[in-house]
Amino acid sequence: MGIDVNIRITGGAGQGVHTAGGLISRMAVAAGHHFHATQDYMSRIRGGRNSYSVRVMDSPVRAGRAGADILLALDPAHLPHFLPSVDPPGLVLSDLPADAPAGRVTSAPLSRLAVSAGSPILGNMVGTGIVARALGIPLDTVDRLLALEFRDDFLEKNRQAVRLGAGWAEGRVPGAFRLPPAEFRPRLILSGNEALALGAIAGGCKFAAGYPMTPGSSILLGLSADGPPLGLVFEQAEDEIAALNMAIGASYAGARAMVATSGGGFALMAEALSLAGMMETPVVIALAMRPGPATGMPTRTGQEDLSFALSAGHGEFPRLVLAPGSVEEAYSLAFHAMEMAEAHQVPCILLTDQHLADTVVDADPEGLEVRPVRRRIARGAEVPRDGEGRYLRYAVTPDGVSPMAVPGEPGVTVVADSDEHGEDGHLTEDPGVRIRMVEKRARKEKGLAAEALPPLLSGPPDGEVALVGFGSTKGVIAEAREILAREGVPAAAVHLRQVGPFPSGAMDGILARYGTVLTVENNRTGQLARLIRAETGREVSGTVSRFDGLPFTPGELAREIRERL
């Protein structure tokens, strides 16, 4: 068995939980290993009970796990909640009162050493120094990583705090969790939302707008930070309605455009989504799901908006709905969304969720492919005109996709309307024209379906059990499948990257080969199971649901599947 160490840092908002977790993650990469970090945080600015878990392995990590090997509790009041998750013989560190009884917890003087380092807020760095010693990470490595984060006097204080923590740990902390030396390989440290933003930029996004809404806000941060040097214009709008209308306007003018939001913001965008459908204007909407309804649980995870994304907006119009299942897929599918939205002149929805949004991994730079962007703007002789020389923005074509010119093309007036319209873009109430235009738009479904991303199948190509999921359940299903295989229960994992148009034929062919089919979903009603039934006519055997706001973990999922079989 290879390396598998799970470090969990806990504390209130403002105690530096995220900073410590991020530094420990980079320490693992610097030592030549891989990590998968997940965050669990409350919807408050200060206080609360937050955690940052870093799972370190000697091979790429696909999911977090429930049990911790090292627990660093920056607030000892959190120990009763987190202690049960520590696997024996785990190391538990916290700043206990002097009169606290001895037990499973190693009392570490985090506060005293933080003050000695120059600031009482440096307890997280003292604890990081202790963890570095437990993992066998050289202090010069930690110093180098700190220099990437801090400057001047505060850098020296952080370095001193780490040294004091590591010095205290000498002789007090067991070496059971030391990471063996491994060859360093350059890696990119990315969250799901950071990868999604980079994929959109690589896909040619030149305009982005949004109104902050957790867990989609960090997509906007990534776009606004990394996009402008590459020609992207970013606008923080007054609300989600304005954001999507701005993006549609930018797309009409020829810029690839996107927005990012969560469920409540997407609800406000529904009318503009229909506008994009009627105008046949390409636009990408990143929908970062969280538990609802209404405000729901802003900082928790869920997959409750699958059906909403597939049917939002009034009227009937084609759309593409993609669901990345990993940080790497967040990048590649964001690129794909930009390309497909313009190729088919449809809105494209990228479904992610808080779990994937905030998951951080070390990604292989070569796996994040940068390809040439293929623009599909009609120019010159490509612009269709009627007998009077007018541009036919909505020219009827066999595949439903009309040559798209943009304002500024010489001799061309680009007419677009939210009313039903004819080929020239001017509104109409002619029943015959209405039928032709509805059928024209609908023909895009065939093109989208022909280019549908097929389900990804791993494990036995046929047999007794298939586990089906979409989006962020990909990694946890894959690891749960491996746990079941070791226990003598062979199962296949089926991951859907595209849910609309649904890859019905491919999915039906796969599911026909298995006796028991279970969907794994972070919602109560089995929305994926309903979608499979509607699109293939197949009734799945059951649904493993979790809707408490927390993600599945591999061991828990494998246990529940065993109970179902």
Name the predicted role of every residue range.
Residues 1-203, 207:
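Active-site cofactor/cluster-binding pocket
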Residues 2-66, 70-83, 207, 214-311, ...:
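Thiamine diphosphate
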Residues 13, 110-122, 127-150, 313-314, ...:
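Peripheral docking tails and interdomain loops at the edges
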Residues 42-45, 99-101, 113, 217, ...:
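Short gly/pro/ser/thr-enriched loop/turn and capping motifs at secondary-structure boundaries
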Residues 86-92, 103, 232, 281, ...:
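A short helix->loop->beta-strand "cap" motif at the edges of active sites that frequently abuts
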Residues 171-185, 200-205, 223-230, 286-288, ...:
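Gly-rich Lys/Arg/Thr-decorated short loops/hinges at beta-loop-alpha junctions or inter-strand turns
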Residues 190-193, 333, 338-565:
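Flexible, low-complexity linker and terminal segments
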